[in-house]
């Protein structure tokens, strides 16, 4: 990944030299020399990345170069911080004057001298590497084709090809089973064959959903214990029990399933330790049609779980026709799966033949080509690269790994760093997308291009990996926005191997720059890794980290730490004391404390975190106060205080954080002692705003137009939980959201009729609308538009609105572009084309949803 490290560094250096020339004048010569050498070396670094896999000398040289660039980048940040480059103009001006102080001269000289030494060492590495690459000149540097080709996911991961027969067969087994017996089925086959996909198709089938009162999905990693598996089953049943012993857990499972027809899927079971199976198997109730599906790569596992041979399904490779169809669905996803260029069809079929019918391989190569230019010479180059990777393989598994290696090799440089962060997460872990994106921004992996903001560019990176089928979507919102994801275990194997060789991360936590915190964390891993750049909570759903306060003291030894995510953690001391220690980490750019306890307030010492760009304290229910020093974080891009129920208001001065792109959980003050809504109008870079409005006096009359000129704002969420008073309804009704708004969410709205501005005339660009909970009974007349004015809404969600009355036909007439409607717990919407709308509800879809 040295090409990724160099690319990120060059981008930062270029920006600093162009925009901050005065503050780096002491080091300008060294930076320019460094920039020149690295630009030249970019021309062969990608080839060096490939060749180092078989050349020990090259591997060592590339590793040395990577470490030198890391050090140069750290010096660069030190220079910026020392010169006051934190976005605060007054501080920057004063800091520049302080550079003239005699006490500063030795420090400046030391940094300048070290940059000079790094330059000399890099020049030497260049001379040693050059002989491996002939005819290389700086003009040979190619661009990363497809880097910005798609800014949102294009390929629909729910599309399934060639597995209809498999699904039909399994459903027949389930429906014909003897209810008096426990049915055990096994899906057996190599990784990447589609076992999990078949199980998901069956699990999510409507007929299966109606037949089984309880459906449970458990991802069984190689390191799972019987206790973890039992707790996972209980979480599927809505029970987040803690502290119980195994016997109690098993009895609870029995109680939940007794008298119910149930289906349990045990996905990806390995044969290393199956002692857990006997207890669970013996404890499962019989006599009401219970069924268990086990997916595994091992025939011995199928026998061990007592799956009869006639109930063991062995998926076959895809046929040539289905292989081509799946490839087209991915590679030509932007063209509805149609290949319209004969020259691409020929080379495409040649590539598909090399995939040998393996779905994971086909999707990986198809996703790669989706993101490349659709021209013959580029596809021919990829075909030859693929052939090189396949050479010498002796098994189907080798072929899958070769396709994944090809996909990694062909990634744009910055996406290589992004994908390697997934090496930190445990097997089968469901990963929050925002955690990934925030970490990428904090570490500087995200390239801001084509006028895209930092957060938008971070989303683009995620889409780039999703379109390449390297990340699998787990959960989406009604609007198609991805919430959580995961990676296939074979993709995980690849990124762990690369990350370990490049000292990015290491499962043993040694000699690396990134660590994942999960469960009871071994603090020694921090002690032996003082060069850490990222520490991320990788706890699985429903679990927490239990950390002690001594950990904070060890964090302070990692002075170059950029990302610290200790979300979903419980500490044995007040978190303010721990944050007091963390405040010394001046390179810190991303700090996540989401769902961390006990956090009551931030310490004043946090004012020293001048490099902070992302601060996430969402779901900290005990947080009562934000220190005024938060307004000093002039680089802040994201401030998330969602669901901080005890927080009274924000401090004055939030309006000075003009780089903010995302502000969530914002509670306008009820008095002049805190931040008023009027300050928000200064945040002209806002893309996403979440308001918490509970009292009418949070908004003054003269503040009602505070949102109208936020020209970049795309999403607004208004949460009125625990509100009272007609005055609040009047104030919300008089607000003026900006016309270009793309997505709107109303939660716990107290009014009986919709706000007057909720109309296609006032919000002509609105694409997604969500109204959840509250007292809404009807929509005001402007909501329905007229024959000349219609909504452009594509996605609508209505939830927990017990009194809302709305006609389905009238709704469709006013929303002609509607593609999907999600509705539940809305008993008065009887005319809707959604089954059980008054209870669990469902989704109506006109056509497959594509984000525009």
From Swiss-Prot:
Residues 164-410 form the NB-ARC domain. Belongs to the disease resistance NB-LRR family. RPP13 subfamily. Changing residue 14 to A: Reduced ability to mediate cell death as well as an increased sensitivity to the pathogenic biotrophic bacteria Xanthomonas campestris pv. campestris (Xcc). InterPro entries: Apaf_helical, Disease_R_plants, LRR_dom_sf, LRR_R13L4/SHOC2-like, NB-ARC, P-loop_NTPase, RX-like_CC, Rx_N. One of its GO terms (biological process) is regulation of immune response. One of its GO terms (cellular component) is plasma membrane. Pfam families: LRR_14 (PF23598), NB-ARC (PF00931), Rx_N (PF18052), WH_DRP (PF23559). PANTHER family: DISEASE RESISTANCE PROTEIN RP (PTHR23155), DISEASE RESISTANCE RPP13-LIKE PROTEIN 4 (PTHR23155:SF1172). LRR repeats lie at residues 558-581, 585-609, 633-657, 683-706, 763-786, 798-824. The gene is RPP13L4. Changing residue 825 to A: Impaired interaction with RKS1 and reduced ability to mediate cell death as well as an increased sensitivity to the pathogenic biotrophic bacteria Xanthomonas campestris pv. campestris (Xcc). The keyword Phosphoprotein does not apply. It comes from Arabidopsis thaliana (Mouse-ear cress). Its main location: membrane. GO terms for molecular function: ADP binding. Residues 17-68 form a coiled coil. Changing residue 149 to A: Reduced oligomerization activity associated with a reduced ability to mediate cell death as well as an increased sensitivity to the pathogenic biotrophic bacteria Xanthomonas campestris pv. campestris (Xcc). Exhibits autoinhibition activity. ADP binds at residues 149, 161, 189-196, 297, 363. This is Disease resistance RPP13-like protein 4. Disruption phenotype: Increased sensitivity to the pathogenic biotrophic bacteria Xanthomonas campestris pv. campestris (Xcc). Reduced resistance to Pseudomonas syringae expressing HopZ1a. It is found in: Cell membrane; Nucleus.
């Amino acid at each position: 990944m040295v090409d990724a490290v160099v690319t990120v560094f060059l981008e930062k250096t270029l920006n600093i030299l162009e925009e901050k020339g005065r503050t780096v004048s002491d080091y300008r010569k060294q930076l320019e020399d460094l920039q020149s050498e690295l630009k030249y070396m970019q021309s062969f670094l990608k080839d060096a990345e490939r060749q180092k896999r078989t050349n020990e000398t090259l591997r060592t040289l590339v590793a040395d170069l990577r470490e030198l660039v890391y050090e140069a980048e750290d010096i660069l940040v030190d220079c910026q911080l020392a010169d006051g480059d934190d976005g605060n103009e007054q501080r920057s001006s004063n800091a520049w004057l302080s550079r003239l102080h005699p006490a500063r001269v030795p420090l400046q000289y030391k940094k300048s001298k070290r940059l000079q030494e790094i330059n000399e060492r890099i020049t030497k590495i260049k001379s040693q590497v050059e002989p491996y690459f002939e005819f290389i000149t700086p003009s040979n540097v190619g661009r990363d084709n497809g880097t910005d080709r798609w800014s949102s996911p294009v390929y629909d991961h729910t599309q399934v090809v060639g597995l209809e027969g498999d699904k039909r067969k399994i459903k027949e087994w389930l429906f014909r089973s003897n209810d008096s017996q426990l049915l055990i089925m096994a899906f057996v086959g190599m990784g990447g064959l589609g076992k999990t996909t078949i199980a998901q198709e069956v699990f999510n089938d409507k007929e299966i959903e109606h037949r089984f009162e309880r459906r449970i999905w458990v991802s069984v990693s190689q390191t799972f214990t019987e206790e973890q598996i039992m707790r996972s089953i209980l979480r599927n049943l809505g029970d987040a029990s803690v502290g119980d012993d195994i016997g109690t857990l098993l009895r609870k499972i029995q109680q939940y399933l007794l008298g119910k027809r149930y289906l349990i899927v045990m996905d990806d079971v390995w044969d290393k330790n199956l002692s857990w199976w006997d207890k669970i198997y013996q404890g499962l109730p019989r006599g009401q049609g219970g069924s268990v599906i086990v997916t595994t790569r091992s025939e011995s596992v199928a026998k061990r779980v007592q799956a009869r041979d006639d109930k063991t399904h062995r998926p076959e490779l895809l046929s040539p026709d289905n292989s081509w169809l799946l490839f087209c669905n991915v590679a030509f996803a932007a063209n509805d799966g149609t290949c319209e260029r004969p020259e691409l069809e020929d080379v495409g079929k040649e590539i598909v033949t090399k995939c040998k019918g393996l779905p994971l391989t086909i999707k990986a190569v198809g996703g790669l080509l989706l993101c490349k230019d659709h021209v013959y010479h580029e596809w021919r180059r990829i075909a030859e690269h693929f052939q090189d990777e396949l050479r010498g393989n002796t098994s189907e598994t080798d072929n899958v790994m070769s396709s994944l290696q090809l996909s990694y090799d062909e990634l744009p440089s910055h996406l290589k760093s992004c994908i390697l962060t997934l090496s930190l997460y445990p097997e089968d872990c469901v990963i929050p997308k925002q955690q990934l994106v925030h970490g990428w921004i904090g570490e500087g992996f995200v390239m801001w291009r084509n006028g895209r903001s930092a957060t938008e560019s971070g989303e683009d990176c995620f889409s780039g990996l999703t379109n390449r089928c390297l990340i699998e979507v787990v959960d989406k919102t009604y609007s198609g926005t991805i919430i959580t994801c995961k990676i296939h275990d074979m993709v995980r194997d690849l990124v762990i191997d690369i990350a370990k060789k490049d000292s990015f991360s290491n499962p043993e936590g040694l000699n690396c720059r990134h660590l994942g915190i999960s469960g009871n964390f071994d603090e020694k891993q921090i002690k032996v890794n003082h060069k850490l750049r990222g520490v991320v909570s990788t706890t699985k759903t429903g679990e927490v980290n239990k950390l002690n306060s001594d950990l904070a003291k060890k964090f302070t030894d990692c002075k170059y730490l950029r990302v610290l995510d200790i979300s979903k953690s419980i500490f044995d001391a007040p978190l303010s004391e721990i944050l007091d220690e963390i405040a010394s980490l001046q390179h810190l750019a991303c700090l996540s404390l989401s769902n961390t306890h006990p956090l009551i307030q931030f310490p004043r010492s946090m004012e020293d975190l001048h490099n902070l760009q992302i601060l996430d304290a969402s779901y900290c229910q005990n947080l009562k106060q934000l220190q005024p020093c938060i307004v000093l974080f002039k680089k802040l891009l994201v401030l998330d205080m969602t669901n901080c129920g005890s927080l009274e208001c924000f401090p004055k001065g939030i309006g000075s954080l003009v780089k903010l792109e995302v502000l969530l959980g914002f509670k306008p003050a009820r008095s002049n002692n805190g931040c008023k809504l009027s300050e928000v109008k200064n945040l002209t870079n806002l893309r996403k705003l979440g308001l918490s409005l509970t009292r009418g006096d949070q908004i003054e009359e003269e503040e009602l137009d505070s949102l109208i000129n936020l020209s970049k704002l795309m999403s607004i969420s208004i949460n009125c939980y625990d509100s009272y008073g007609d005055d609040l309804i009047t104030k919300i009704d008089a607000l003026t959201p900006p016309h270009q708004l793309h997505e709107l969410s109303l939660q716990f709205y107290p009014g009986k009729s919709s706000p007057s501005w909720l109309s296609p005339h006032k919000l002509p660009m609105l694409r997604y609308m969500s109204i959840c909970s509250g007292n809404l009974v009807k929509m005001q007349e402007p909501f329905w538009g007229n024959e000349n004015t219609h909504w452009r809404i594509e996605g609508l969600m209505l939830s927990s609105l017990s009194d809302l009355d709305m006609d389905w036909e009238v709704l469709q007439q006013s929303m002609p572009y509607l593609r999907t409607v999600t509705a539940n717990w809305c008993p008065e919407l009887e005319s809707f084309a959604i089954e059980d709308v008054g209870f669990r509800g469902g989704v109506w879809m006109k056509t497959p949803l594509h984000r525009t």
